[in-house]
């Protein structure tokens, strides 16, 4: 009996040490892709679709931006950016198959202003009901990001 328990204990220890490690490159490839559709606020014309991940991340990373409590009602919208992200890969789905995108945020820029309004899509937060005004944020967009955005539009 002691031999069986000892063998099971050794077997269990061996199994816990034999964990499969995914290479870092493969993990990075499996990240969800994002894209931005950039529209004119005046006529809702699609100006550009941005799917370069570095550019998307740069335009949407608001972590270092100045948070503003509110913005003036006098500001006129200039551009509307719709940010999309690939839907989560579900069990049984082929990882090589193209996935649909879901809207995660709407960002509105304003004429002659560095202020933006970010509206987080309520579909991003699953299984919770959050008031709509809790999903709206205002920021002052840094000058370099603003310049990058205008360069993308002028291309």
Where are these regions (language model features)?
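Function-determining sites in protein domains
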Residues: 19-155
């Amino acid at each position: 009996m002691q031999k069986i328990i000892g063998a099971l204990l050794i077997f269990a220890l061996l199994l816990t040490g034999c964990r499969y490690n995914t290479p870092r490159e493969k993990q990075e490839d499996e990240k969800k892709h994002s894209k931005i559709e950039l529209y004119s606020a005046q006529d809702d014309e699609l100006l550009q679709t941005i799917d370069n991940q570095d550019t998307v991340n740069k335009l949407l990373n608001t972590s270092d931006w100045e948070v503003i409590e509110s913005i003036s009602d006098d500001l006129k919208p200039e551009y509307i950016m719709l940010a999309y992200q690939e839907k989560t890969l579900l069990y049984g789905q082929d990882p090589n198959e193209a996935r649909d995108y879901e809207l995660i945020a709407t960002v509105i820029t304003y004429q002659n202003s560095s202020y933006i309004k970010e509206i987080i899509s309520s579909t991003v937060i699953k299984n919770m009901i959050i008031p709509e005004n809790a999903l709206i944020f205002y920021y002052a967009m840094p000058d370099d990001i603003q310049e990058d955005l205008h360069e993308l539009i002028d291309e």
